[in-house]
């Protein structure tokens, strides 16, 4: 059985992951970080920074879906990734990854012929506005357009 520690377990994604894990006999959620096989982080940037240090100390791989990470936290992730397996994605949706691939292709074929803007709408309880996905797409457009 794979032991998962969910950092941010009371949030929307953390609750969803917890429900999925509880419905699967191959995984178990643990409250004890040191007994975890993997840490899944959907928390807040300040909490992500702390959990990275704990994972380094105990050599625990990570999946990070927290958004709004600043340069300092991203640098910590980069350093930790040299020691630990880390998956970092602001959005885990297959559709978003397909959208990003399509945007890259479109921009390459239509450089200097279009102007882009991003508008997003969320539920009232959305904590990170603009979303990590919107920021990622904005950066992708800027990077591909140069």
Label each region the model flagged:
Residues 1-5:
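Extreme N-terminal starter segment of soluble prokaryotic enzymes
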């Amino acid at each position: 059985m794979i032991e998962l520690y969910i950092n941010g377990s009371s949030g929307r994604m953390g609750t969803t992951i917890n429900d999925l894990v509880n419905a699967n006999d191959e995984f178990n959620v643990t409250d004890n970080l040191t007994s975890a096989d993997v840490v899944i982080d959907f928390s807040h940037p300040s909490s992500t920074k702390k959990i990275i240090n704990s994972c380094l100390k105990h050599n625990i791989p990570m999946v990070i879906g927290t958004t709004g990470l600043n340069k300092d936290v991203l640098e910590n992730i980069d350093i930790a990734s040299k020691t630990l397996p880390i998956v970092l994605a602001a959005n885990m949706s297959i559709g978003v990854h397909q959208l990003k691939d399509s945007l890259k292709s479109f921009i390459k074929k239509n450089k200097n012929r279009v102007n882009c803007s991003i508008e997003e709408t969320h539920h009232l309880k959305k904590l990170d506005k603009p979303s990590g996905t919107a920021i990622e797409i904005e950066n992708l457009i800027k990077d591909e357009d140069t």
